[in-house]
């Protein structure tokens, strides 16, 4: 026996314990679900490790979880004969939160109990949920393959610290005893525990057992036969079969939902799921879930994602990311293959034909689920899009084979609806295209307001041509990889010519040519005045109400792409913009009449800076712009 050691909880654990006790109080029975789930995982891990080392079973291969209560002592005990933990493992797993992004998680907490409980559920509280109902927790554990004298006793009141000491334990596995708070003694009741197991843990694939007391002998009477005494025994409270191996028709929605909560540690029901068994060239079963809410650490680069992998119903690994592309990293679930070796490793999965085929199949399955949802329940799909739309937008750059299908699932804001809500599909847009229209017009800006109010839309609005309004950071990246849909090119209204084609009649083209001819002198004067600040000056084809605008040339980087790359730390030289003038605007007409070359230069500079500010949202030298504007305002009032 070793001397008892006291360790302090990691700061984040203290915070989590405090939050959990206060935020999850209304859903306190989940402690049993979490602990049974952990115990089942420990059994799965032992089963996998024992594939290459049968001695780990120590002569006992019947894996199970046992739950018991002691009313007098006010305790509940959850015991498993799974993989167990070493002393170092106990300190690591029961004293710290080994998750990247933990600090970010705590920043997201708002103080609103209902919102925070949902976030805490997404975070996954696991073992620490014990302290929702217990004021002291005792853990006795021994790792499989270690001697009886290498067992560990861990104890804590869930406050600042915990104690650890080495003890003797004959059986492998982990035994957790909860010393219930005075107002939580209802859980020290067999009937209450049975009802929770039935509710939350029926899908667990190892038996979850409780002790059933024996019955005394009954002597025979004139009317009845004698009944022999029966001994008490441990009886399973759950079906103890892997849920995904059952027929879909035999699994209820409630069971699917509880299984999702078991594998994801999410407290909320999933949005939808798909359960499929495939036989033939590939033999596998998949159970895939789309969550209702995005995880708090969705954008954390170190976040683990992927499916649980089983081979012939034996658990092999968590977070097998090889089966799901990054743009579908929100998908939860499992895949059970009959074609992979049981000793498969992440390295073997990397370049494996079976893995590639399974990845292709489950990717198509998820896209099919989303297509069906979008078609049959637009409101529910909109809910999905709000949570995961930005992630799905990574798809066209990542998955060339499914680019068109992914594009069909994208949603955008549009001038057609006048709303900021992105609820317009590319198919919707094409359906509303005007006769003679050959392009899908879009604009990318810093915000929805900037996109909707951009001067670049003026002529298109006047002609009733719909424009997709994009304002998320990923949109410029997306649009660089999604250049057409259903045979229609996507065309930026802020780059090059509008290329209206048949949308302009002969009279309009003639008037435009006439305007360009009449403005040749003005265009040359402005270019001479601005010099190399602009690449070109030309008469606009897109403005009706604004005096001037800047556009990127064909093939040049857009303003938004430059911002994106600069934000990523890349040094990007900014190309000179094309400066477009609207000769029919009074300010440009005034400019054309100006004979004083100094005044002309100031007016030209002012219009250029205005156009740059409108396009970029900022200026390289705002002080110089304000000084120029003040000079001109003073001149106008003299």
Curated annotation (Swiss-Prot):
Pfam families: HATPase_c_3, HSP90. Homodimer. Keywords: ATP-binding, Chaperone, Cytoplasm, Nucleotide-binding, Stress response. InterPro entries: HATPase_C_sf, Heat_shock_protein_90_CS, HSP90_C, Hsp90_fam, Hsp90_N, Ribosomal_Su5_D2-typ_SF. The lineage of its organism: Bacteria, Pseudomonadati, Pseudomonadota, Gammaproteobacteria, Alteromonadales. Belongs to the heat shock protein 90 family. PANTHER family: HEAT SHOCK PROTEIN 90 FAMILY MEMBER. The keyword Disulfide bond does not apply. This is Chaperone protein HtpG. Molecular chaperone. Has ATPase activity. GO terms for molecular function: ATP binding; ATP hydrolysis activity; ATP-dependent protein folding chaperone; unfolded protein binding. It is found in: Cytoplasm. Residues 347-563 are annotated as: B. Residues 564-638 are annotated as: C. Residues 1-346 are annotated as: A. It comes from Shewanella pealeana (strain ATCC 700345 / ANG-SQ1). GO terms for cellular component: cytoplasm. PROSITE patterns: HSP90.
């Amino acid at each position: 026996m070793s001397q008892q050691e006291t360790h302090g909880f990691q700061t984040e654990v203290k915070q989590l314990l405090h939050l959990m006790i206060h935020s999850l109080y209304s859903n306190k029975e989940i402690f049993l679900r979490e602990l049974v789930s952990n115990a089942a995982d420990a059994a799965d891990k032992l089963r996998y490790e024992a594939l290459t080392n049968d001695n780990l079973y120590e002569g006992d291969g019947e894996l199970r979880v046992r739950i018991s209560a002691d009313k007098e002592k006010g305790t509940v005990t959850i015991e498993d004969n799974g993989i167990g933990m070493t002393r170092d493992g106990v300190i690591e797993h029961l004293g710290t939160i080994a998750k990247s992004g933990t600090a970010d998680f705590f920043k997201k907490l708002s103080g609103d109990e209902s919102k925070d409980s949902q976030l805490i559920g997404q975070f996954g509280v696991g073992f620490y949920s014990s302290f929702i109902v217990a004021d002291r927790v005792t853990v006795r554990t021994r790792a499989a393959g270690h001697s009886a004298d290498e067992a560990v006793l861990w104890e804590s009141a869930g406050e600042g610290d915990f104690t650890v000491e080495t003890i003797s334990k004959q059986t492998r596995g982990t035994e957790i005893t909860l010393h219930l708070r005075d107002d939580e003694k209802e859980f020290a009741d067999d009937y209450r525990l049975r009802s929770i197991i039935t509710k939350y843990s029926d899908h667990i694939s190892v038996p979850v057992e409780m002790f059933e007391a024996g019955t005394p002998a009954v002597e025979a009477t004139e009317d009845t036969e004698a009944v022999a005494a029966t001994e008490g025994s441990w009886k399973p409270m759950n079906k103890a079969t892997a849920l995904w191996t059952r027929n879909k028709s035999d699994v209820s929605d409630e069971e699917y939902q509880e299984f999702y909560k078991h594998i994801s540690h999410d407290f909320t029901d999933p949005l939808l799921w798909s359960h499929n068994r495939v036989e033939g060239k590939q033999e596998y079963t998949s159970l895939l879930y789309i969550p209702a809410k995005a995880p708090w650490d969705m954008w954390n680069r170190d976040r683990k994602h992927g499916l649980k992998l089983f081979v012939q119903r034996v658990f092999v690994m968590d977070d097998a990311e090889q089966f799901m592309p990054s743009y579908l990293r929100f998908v939860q679930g499992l895949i059970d293959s009959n074609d992979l070796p049981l000793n498969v490793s992440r390295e073997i999965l990397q370049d494996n034909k079976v893995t590639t085929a399974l990845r292709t199949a489950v990717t198509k399955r998820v896209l099919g689920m989303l297509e069906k949802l979008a078609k049959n329940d637009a409101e529910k799909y909109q809910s999905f899009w709000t949570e995961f739309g930005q992630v799905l937008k990574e798809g066209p750059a990542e998955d060339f084979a499914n680019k068109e299908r992914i594009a069909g699932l994208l949603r955008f804001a549009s001038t057609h609806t006048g709303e900021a809500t992105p609820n317009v599909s590319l198919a919707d847009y094409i359906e509303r295209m005007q006769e003679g229209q050959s392009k899908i017009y879009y604009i990318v800006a810093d915000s929805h307001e900037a996109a909707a109010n951009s001067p670049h839309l003026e002529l298109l609005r006047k002609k009733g041509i719909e424009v997709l309004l994009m304002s998320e950071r990923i949109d410029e990246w997306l649009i660089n990889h999604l250049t057409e849909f259903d045979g229609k090119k996507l065309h930026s209204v802020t780059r090059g010519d509008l290329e209206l084609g048949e949308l302009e009649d002969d009279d309009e083209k003639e008037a435009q040519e006439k305007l360009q001819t009449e403005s040749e002198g003005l265009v040359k004067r402005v270019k001479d005045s601005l010099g190399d600040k602009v690449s070109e000056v030309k008469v606009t084809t897109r403005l009706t109400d604004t005096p001037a605008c800047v556009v990127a040339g064909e093939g040049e980087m857009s303003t938004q792409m430059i911002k994106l790359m600069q934000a990523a730390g890349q040094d990007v030289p900014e190309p000179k913009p094309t400066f477009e003038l609207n000769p029919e605007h009074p300010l440009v007409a005034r400019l054309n009449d100006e004979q004083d070359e100094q005044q002309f230069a100031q007016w030209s500079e002012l219009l250029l800076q205005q156009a740059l500010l409108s396009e970029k949202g900022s200026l390289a030298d705002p002080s110089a712009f304000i000084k120029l504007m003040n000079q001109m305002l003073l001149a106008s009032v003299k």
